[in-house]
Design a protein with these regions (language model features):
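Bacterial N-terminal signal peptides that target proteins for export
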Residues: 1-8
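Bacterial N-terminal signal peptides
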Residues: 8-18
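Lumenal/extracellular ectodomains and adaptor appendage modules
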Residues: 18, 22-154
């Protein structure tokens, strides 16, 4: 049975690798001046995760980004090797797989580097200034549960 889980960014630490930007509150009156020295800021981030019975997470991430200067886009790093410690003290290393990546109209290239799946969103030929919305959809496969009589999600 599938469950729809809407998770806050802070609760999904393995999926919330930094995208090299500062988080900011867009409704602050001095928002632009406060972060004007940064190349860009993430003004909002939302994630929706659908968990299948086979431990595959169908993830949709939406980022509102404000570019203070001309940039080609952003990077998104997804961890492929996850070390975890369970409540009983046992440890495990889980290797995840990323598939079915869709970034809509935004150009995207990817590579695997240092146990991370690296997404480069944006165009080498064009730059962006001002607000831009990125939506990234992908499957994050954690493999089958290895703990008997329990489901494991981290």
């Amino acid at each position: 049975m599938k469950k729809i889980i809407t998770l806050l960014l802070a609760l999904v630490l393995p999926l919330c690798a930094p995208i090299y930007a500062l988080a900011a509150t867009p409704d602050e009156s001095d928002f632009l001046s406060r972060y004007a020295q940064e190349p860009y800021v993430v003004t909002d981030c939302q994630m929706q995760v659908v968990v299948s019975e086979y431990n595959v997470l169908a993830v949709t991430e939406t980022y509102q980004v404000y570019f203070n200067e001309a940039r080609h886009g952003i990077y998104r790093y997804l961890p492929l090797r996850n070390q975890l410690t369970r409540t009983d003290g046992s440890t495990a290393v889980v290797t995840a797989r990323v598939s079915h990546v869709d970034t809509g109209a935004d150009e995207c290239s990817h590579e695997v580097s240092n146990d991370k799946y690296v997404l480069r969103l944006g165009s080498e030929d064009e730059t962006i200034t001002g607000p831009h919305t990125y939506t990234i959809r992908y499957n994050y496969d954690l493999g089958l549960d290895t703990v008997k009589n329990a489901d494991e999600l981290y």
